């Protein structure tokens, strides 16, 4: 807000996934903020998520689309990390069973991988990246710990939701009402942190991040 007026601001969400867009819209509520998905802009590329971490993928998506659309852009990369599988499926969560992405095949593969495993601790991780129109990005992270079930439960949600019960609850993500899931999920936690961290930037129509004046010598000039 400037002088008490709400400045309209457009925020591009780097996704064509209607579930994800709806979840972000429900959480990211600020006066004057208009949220649009990638389909609302013509000619935006599909960004190849080839990073080795959620952080790398989130930043790549946010920066690529921000530069193309010349608009503040929010991207997330998220997935499931299973302790007994050394963090798999991790960044491969959407394509765990191969191409094209297939939720049923992914869930079936996960059940097979954990068939004889008693220790079923897991966590959903979400990294949210926000890029300025000029391509400078910052990130925040949200984590939801829980465990993997021995069978699918529930029909709500998407992805691995029917397989995952968050710590402190008896219902799987796919059995929960959206209102509850949108309070405790990894994406909810990351977006809540994003709101707290970036509220001032998103409340105005800034062209870039506020300047942080820290003089830094180039590495080759030191010593």
Residue spans for each PLM region:
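N-terminal amphipathic/basic-hydrophobic helices that include classical n-h-c signal peptides
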Residues: 1-8, 222
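Anionic-ligand binding patches
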Residues: 10-12, 18-223
